[in-house]
Amino acid sequence: MIYRRLGRTDLNVSLLSLGTGGARRFGQATDMTLIDQQALLHHAIDLGVNLIDTAEQYGESESILGRCLRGIPRNQYFLSTKWSPRIGEEFVPDPVALQASVERSLKRLGTDYIDIMFFHGPRVAEYGAVVDQLYPVLDALRNAGKIRSVGLSTPFVYDPAQEVARIALTENPAMWDVVMLKYGILNQHAANHILTLADRYDVGVMNMAAVRIKLPNPVLLEELIR
């Protein structure tokens, strides 16, 4: 396995990570048993994967991970999770809800700290409120030792050019330790500005859903290659 320092953080992460979202949500959609979920997670760790990503919005993924990770030394893996400032389609920048969400995530994951806490997919028009009203909550939690790094993930379905990340790294690069982007064959917008800015300011980059849709499906993969 290849490892890299994730931006300015002190996290030396595996090039490949294990995600628990998408349509399957770590086997929730396919009725995978806890034994099989544990086997999958342990196999990934045995292969050298040490970065595991989840979110409160991924059904029971955090709780499942918490059970699967029992008995594995905490220094063998890094955890990233996310909180969305949305209720349905409504943007609700509630600092109290964010604080409560982090506490719930800690309890479900069975850990004293989260390595990377992301804002989950805020849109361009919402970015200012995230910075002014919500970021101070995560900054305080970082100072308290409950999170180690603060990140921003992009809502690429609503913002294919991922302008929110460009704005974040242009206006407030020192605030963001990590950004999570969608980058691949069919969406290379990040190469225009965002990756250059991330490199300039030593901001870590995580690529979401790198193999989730096309590569596991031979038919879609063949169509993509054609």
PLM feature segments, named:
Residues 6, 18, 44, 52, ...:
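Conserved, mostly hydrophobic/aromatic
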Residues 30-44, 91-110, 158-170:
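Short, acidic/polar
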